A protein has these predicted regions:
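ATP/Mg2+ or Mg2+-diphosphate-binding catalytic cores
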Residues: 91-136
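All-alpha amphipathic helical-bundle segments outside canonical DNA-binding/catalytic cores
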Residues: 72-82
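Short flexible/disordered coil segments
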Residues: 11-17, 29, 71-72, 115-119, ...
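Active-site acidic catalytic loop and adjacent metal/ATP-binding pocket
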Residues: 1-39
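Alpha-helical structural motif
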Residues: 37-40, 76, 109, 122
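Active-site activation/catalytic loop segments of kinase-like enzymes and analogous catalytic loops
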Residues: 38-71, 84-102
Length: 136
């Protein structure tokens, strides 16, 4: 068995967690997969941090909360960093533009790219801080 590998939800985000007074439940296992388990944390963090302008304190608190339940190995820490560093949002927009017969119109693509550009400084600061832990 490879380090950190196991069954993953595959689309772990805030929309797939149901909170009740006595418990929380994870739903929608349509994308279940065998992967590095830290991948679920990376997907969850990306969604939350994008909505919170890559807030450093929030991101580090999410990592601490995860680590309190399951310690991350150096390999998993690097995996988390690399998965968050991948420019997923840019890739999705570029891929959509290339493959979707320009359904949105060029202005819509520019608008989405400008939004990514506005988030980039905070994203890069967060990633620089995280890189220190992943590669030290």
């Amino acid at each position: 068995k490879k380090e950190g590998m196991g069954i993953c939800h595959g689309d772990f985000n805030q929309h797939n967690i149901v909170f009740r007074s006595e418990y929380a439940a994870v739903i929608s296992f349509d994308n279940i997969c065998y992967d590095v388990q830290i991948g679920d944390l990376a997907r969850f963090m990306r969604k939350i941090l994008e909505k919170n302008n890559w807030n450093m304190g929030l991101g580090m608190e999410m990592i601490r909360a995860y680590s309190d339940k399951k310690a991350m190995s150096p390999y998993e820490t690097k995996q988390l960093y690399l998965r968050l560093a991948y420019p997923e949002k840019f890739w999705k927009i570029a891929n959509h533009y290339y493959n979707a017969n320009k359904a949105w119109g060029f202005g819509r693509y520019l608008e989405k790219l400008e939004k990514i550009k506005a988030e980039e400084e905070n994203r890069e600061q967060f990633l620089a801080y995280m890189k220190h832990f992943a590669y030290s």
